[in-house]
Amino acid sequence: MNWEEIGNLDFKNDNTAYMMECPNLVFVDDKPVLIYCPQGLDKDVFHYDNIYPNLYKIGETFDQENATITPVSELHQLDYGFDVYATQAFNAPDGRALCISWLGLPDVSYPSDVYEHQGILSLVKELSIKDGKLYQTPVKGIEKLRQSSLPFNKYIKNTSNCYELNLKLEGDTIHELVLFSDKDGNGLSLIFNLVDGEVVVDRSKVGEAFATEYSSVRTAPIAPADTTARIFIDNSVFEIFINDGEMVFSGRVFPRADQTHISILQGDPTGVYYPLLSFTKPN
């Protein structure tokens, strides 16, 4: 493979970040998408809660001779959760645009550090563009990990904390469920406020707290309408795909041994629960 330097990429950068870490250019639905982590980005330019954000811009065309993306969109949040970083995207031989994220932020201490282990990889996600937004959905192959299917009801106890949960949430209603829940309902709180139009993810009551200086709560606006959520849990990881990947919340948690239940505190979500084979252990 031969490389030729054309020049610095022109993507209408605001130049407030001191480092553009892990930049990658991928083509999604024939449009150039730049995904990167601007360390030190001025929050007056783009608000973010994590120590460093993972953002993207979408262009209409890529001028290879002049290394220019034109016209280019505003900055967008790639993931609304706590720990996504250094997302790497690529175009597969079959034409799909795929990406995988690092779940673990630099310069943040995690409970697993004492075991000389930090970070984990996300699910592999397929990318598409709808209405000027980048959608992310788990690749189809993940479904091979499903062991069975069970109707989701108001309480599931003693899970393995390794499962997929597909939910339908009625609009004009507030739904709250708790993953990694103990018997008293303390765990990872997910609130879908489909009256006022807001999603709230709160990890303050699940296991060992960490990175609290960057808050234990994340929020994002959502249309107050019927909503779907596809949730993946794997022991210390959660990935939540809302409305077919329009919005994603991902993060790490370190639950106590008794936090293995799923509780519903408000609303009446319906759906399907799939116990999964472990993502990380050979079958």
Task: State what each model feature region is.
Residues M1-N2:
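Short beta-strand segments and strand-loop junctions that repeat across beta-rich extracellular domains
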Residues E5-N8, C22-V26, K31-D44, A97-L103, ...:
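Hydrophobic core segments of beta-strands in well-ordered, beta-rich domains
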Residues N8-K12, L75-Q77:
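Short loop/turn motifs that cap or connect beta-strands within the blades
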Residues D14-M20, Y80-D83:
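Short glycine-/Asp-/Thr-/Trp-enriched loop segments that recur within the blades
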Residues A17, H47-Y48:
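Short glycine-biased active-site loop of nucleotidyltransferases that positions the nucleotide triphosphate
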Residues K43-F46, S250:
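A generic structural signal for short coil/turn motifs at secondary-structure boundaries
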Residues F46-H47, I58:
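Beta-propeller blade termini and top-face loops
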Residues Y52-N283:
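Beta-rich accessory regions
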